[in-house]
Amino acid sequence: MADLFEVFLNQGVDAIMGILSQPHICEAISMAEERTGRKMILINTPWLNVDDTAAARKEAEATIRHSKELGATFCFPHHSSAEQLVNKNKGTMDRLPDYLYMIREQGMIPGLSAHMPELIVYSDQNGYDVESYIQIYNCLGFLMQVEIEGIHRIIWNAKKPVMTIKPMAAGRCTPFVGLNFSWATIRPCDMVTVGCLTPEEAVEDIEISLAALERRPPNLEGRSSPNTKTAALSGKHQAH
């Protein structure tokens, strides 16, 4: 895993988002930072106990404090926790400000992990202390709770930068298709988050993304084929 993170850091992709309390992830990040001499920005998305009790609040405070101890710059309550606070009737997220305050108290930047698109809308409408939001967004509408056009509109109307996730719809479309769609349809301030298993996948995703942003074709190998004359698959052609 350290090899994977090293590829990203060497290419200037210096932020990681997820549930970062797993020891092997923290160890791999430290190894990659040591090898490259570069620092990774940590965006932690911890599960919080959001029950309305004194014991639960104490537990949530401890979880948020642990995020700081891990070295996180950003702390976004996990969507499975944040969505428990949603009141669609009132258009609010009850008690969310309590947890955002806890995050600020620890010197971290608060945000929201949002699978429900309403979280972005309610956050903006109520002026919650949220600096960014995570939102599922891909060309297939995979796991998105409303149509693609609706999420696109929410992203463009959002008051803060949106961190989009699942651009390849969990492997249901190719990186070329998924990443080009995402980069072409979000704002300059927004982000695309990718999940990778190998350093080779990281290299490919970075090249496709840079090509999309620079409006050029990506420098990728063609598909392999036992027939060396299959020009359409190899990506090679001869000028006449």
Set out the residue ranges of the language-model regions.
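Active-site beta->alpha loop and helix N-cap motifs at the rims of alpha/beta catalytic domains
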Residues: 1-90
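Structured C-terminal cap/extension of enzyme domains
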Residues: 1-17, 33, 149-164, 168-240
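Hydrophobic faces of well-ordered beta-strands that scaffold small-molecule active sites
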Residues: 15-18, 40-45, 75-77, 110-112, ...
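Active-site beta-loop-alpha junctions enriched in small/polar residues
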Residues: 21, 45-51, 80-82, 115-117, ...
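Glycine-enriched alpha-helix->loop->beta-strand junction motifs that scaffold or abut catalytic
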Residues: 36-37, 69-73, 104-106, 125-134, ...
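Charged helix-capping and loop-helix junction motifs
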Residues: 57-61, 90-97, 146-152, 175-181
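Eukaryote-skewed repeat-based solenoidal scaffolds used as protein-protein interaction platforms
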Residues: 61, 65-72, 76-111, 115-127
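Histidine/lysine/aspartate-rich catalytic loop segments that bind and position anionic ligands
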Residues: 117-146
